[in-house]
Amino acid sequence: MKEPIVLFDEPEISLHTNYLDELAEAITDVNARLNILISTHSSRLTKNLIIECDTILLYNVKLVNRYSLVYRMKRFPQYSPTSKYRVADDHINAYFSRVNLFVEGETELELFSNPYLRILFPKLKKIDVFKAVSEKPVLNIMNPQLSNSQIPYLCLIDIDKAISFDKTRKRFALKPEYLPEDDKERFRYRNKHESSQYLYSQRKRIEAMQRKLHVHYYLPYLSCDDTNYYAFVSALQKYLLSYNVFCLRTTIEGALVNYRTLAFALDFLKRNTKAQNFEKFNVYWKSLHKTDKLNLLRMLFNGKSDLLRSRKEAFKLVDSEIRDTLDTVTIGGKTSGWVSKYLDDFFKETADEIKDTFTEKKFRKYLESEDKRKHVLRLFEENFFELYSLIERLCGMINE
């Protein structure tokens, strides 16, 4: 045979990872005239072959509507050479996903791994969540748009990834990271029966709003109830969705602590802090404007204010005695586990008919009733409207 072909069907089965590494080396060292075709679900083997072999051709095979579709992928060293030294097995797992959700940090990972949330939304089990948004080389490895893997995906970002606010000039600036350059803007053509806007027109409208927008805010927390600002944010969110970017109004903490969950969040804070500390805080909290109340509470859960002021920045500007009081009731930390407990408590209150110990098994049984499932879904949508919108969009991306 002039050009022999060797076929491997899932060679990773029963192989220890060290042997997989040796197999990858053996494959890359064969005679150039020998063609090797490998069918695999091994992220480690795929990673090693991509890194070690410049001539490898990578294909993604998907079953859609009972038809096998084959897509030729790009190897990440081709379009992002620096990513070669950051790649891990977990990153390559994104090539085998049904849907990818790329997030910023630990809080989002904790949220989407909550068992009660996954029971309420079973399709979340088919969505893989990766911490990648804050690390460009890592995101480049997994980004389906760059790799041409044809896997549906969404990037979840905080609003401060898209805009910044100059407190002195009271002006906003658009950040370029998730906004395409003007000359790379997608022009959307439409016929007379279409009513949706051109992306280009949307972009120009956002830029005009950004230049002209002057907002009113409250100190020291940079709280804002200016309707013009929220119209600007809404336009930006709609535009970014066209580029597979779901932009939150503030942060993921803000999606959990919002004006609908204000009473629940305050009660949660009370249950998880010392009584004497909470009483001192409550005296101060009651004296605040209603917009400041929400912003301060959000900061205590490690979120940011409406105009992106962090807890650390804001607390420097308040009286030292008040600052000490606020420090004693601060509950949010990136790895404190409060998100899990917060959601657990919400679902426990929502399914209050469950007696004794609240468990995953009992909650799953409770939701077997269609009326009760609809009740819980309705309350979740009302209280966590931003999170519900995100989950609905993700679930709609799954090809059954």
Where in the sequence are the language-model features?
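Short loop immediately C-terminal to the Walker-B catalytic DE motif
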Residues: 12-13
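GG-anchored amphipathic helix commonly corresponding to the ABC/SMC/Rad50 NBD signature/C-loop
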Residues: 1-8, 17-18, 22
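Loop/turn-to-beta-strand initiation segments
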Residues: 3-5, 32-37
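Conserved H-loop
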Residues: 40-44, 63
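Short regulatory helix/loop adjacent to the ATP-binding pocket of P-loop NTPases
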Residues: 45-55
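Acidic, divalent-metal-binding catalytic cores of TOPRIM
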Residues: 62-400
